[in-house]
């Protein structure tokens, strides 16, 4: 089996691209250690826990001065980390594993999202209810490593992505589905799906409702893969100072996510104030949906890597084929792909201070979206 093209290109990215003009700051200043965290997208509630940890002083309590580096379409967080231009990075597990196979020295030290938030969405009257129904249809996807679950679902349904469907490069919005240029579109539960519900149905003059759409949720058919995780520099993890710093960073991060679980409106406001391009109702929806992906956490606590979920992600990465027959990975990950050592120490620390790290009592909100997400 061959690699995905996106994975093959990552070796070049490791030596040719980056987003930060200055390296990760190596030394403490005045007793405070400066840290750069590379996010994988623009500021939005997907990263509210980190934003809150900065705003609420949780990182400062640990002696860390954390700078959040905004992501974007052309930014590969794990590459920025591997190049030494950030101290930590947030990235989806399969994307990062593909980078590791190409030589990136990175390790998952905190699995913040316990669940996948990826959907494929069709019109309710389309007759599309399962991945098998994609046959003969125009199937939208974003690419850039976001499509692995889609290919996993189609592979599991017995479809050949190169022959049985027409793959369409989708923009990071839902206009192609709304205009019926494609039959099924990729969406995140916390972002693009909300954009559909913020759009006006021209036939009624009212906003679309969930009843207008059919969701294919990869969590329900065994094709889900682990997503947002905190990645560290593997080589630096040999340094006791970086090990200690990682525990501190994770402890403050856990507190940030617990704060957003308990204060979703406040975290929504922090995200909007940070310069989010999307409005208040959209960001509250997103905060609520993100909380569903984080909470309840594993019984051991938020950030602990569940071995069964990790195995499923790796197995899919080895077997799901794209339109050219390539897979995400060609072999099992080697070396220190993940470790629970540092997150466990961080959890012990914040639990001792009274923070709820499992969120077993978490209940999602009911969020009312407005036109355009304003």
Q: Language-model segments: which ranges?
A:
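Bacterial N-terminal signal peptides that target proteins for export
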Residues: 1-6
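C-terminal motif of bacterial Sec signal peptides marking the signal peptidase cleavage site
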Residues: 12-16
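Bacterial lipoprotein signal-peptidase II cleavage site
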Residues: 17-27
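Short, glycine-/small- and polar/acidic-enriched structural segments
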Residues: 26-170, 174-179, 183-190, 216-218
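Short, solvent-exposed loop/beta-turn-alpha elements that line the ligand-binding surface or hinge
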Residues: 61, 207-213, 217-223, 293-307
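Secondary-structure end/capping motifs
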Residues: 239-326
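Conserved C-terminal helix/tail region of periplasmic/extracytoplasmic solute-binding proteins
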Residues: 311-374
């Amino acid at each position: 089996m061959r690699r995905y093209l996106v994975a093959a290109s990552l070796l070049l990215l490791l030596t040719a691209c980056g987003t930060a003009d200055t390296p990760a700051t190596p030394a403490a200043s005045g007793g405070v250690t400066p840290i750069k965290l590379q996010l994988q997208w623009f500021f939005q509630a997907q990263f509210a826990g980190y934003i809150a940890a900065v705003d609420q002083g949780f990182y400062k309590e640990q002696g860390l001065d954390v700078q959040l580096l905004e992501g974007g379409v052309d930014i590969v967080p794990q590459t920025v980390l591997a190049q030494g231009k950030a101290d930590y990075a947030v990235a989806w597990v399969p994307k990062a594993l593909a980078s590791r196979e190409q030589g990136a020295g990175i390790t998952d030290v905190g699995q913040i999202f316990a669940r996948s938030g990826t959907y494929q969405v069709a019109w309710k009257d389309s007759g599309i209810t399962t991945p098998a129904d994609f046959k003969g249809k125009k199937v939208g996807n974003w690419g850039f490593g976001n499509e692995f679950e889609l290919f996993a679902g189609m592979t599991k349904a017995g479809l050949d992505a190169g022959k049985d469907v027409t793959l369409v490069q989708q923009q990071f919005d839902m206009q192609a589905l709304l205009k019926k240029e494609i039959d099924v579109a990729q969406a995140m539960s916390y972002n693009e799906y909300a954009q559909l519900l913020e759009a006006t149905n021209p036939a009624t003059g009212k906003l679309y409702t969930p009843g207008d759409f059919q969701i294919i949720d990869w969590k329900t058919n065994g094709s889900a893969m682990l997503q947002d995780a905190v990645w560290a520099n593997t080589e630096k993890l040999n340094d006791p100072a970086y090990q200690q710093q990682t525990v501190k960073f994770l402890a403050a991060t856990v507190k940030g996510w617990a704060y957003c679980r308990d204060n979703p409106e406040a975290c929504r406001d922090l995200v909007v104030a940070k310069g989010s391009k999307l409005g208040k109702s959209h960001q509250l929806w997103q905060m609520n949906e993100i909380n569903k992906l984080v909470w309840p956490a594993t019984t051991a606590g938020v950030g602990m890597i569940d071995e069964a979920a990790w195995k499923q992600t790796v197995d899919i990465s080895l077997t799901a084929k794209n339109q050219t027959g390539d897979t995400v990975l060609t072999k099992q990950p080697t070396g220190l792909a993940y470790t629970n050592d540092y997150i466990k120490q961080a959890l012990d620390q914040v639990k001792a201070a009274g923070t709820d790290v499992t969120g077993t009592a978490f209940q999602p909100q009911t969020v009312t979206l407005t036109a355009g997400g304003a």
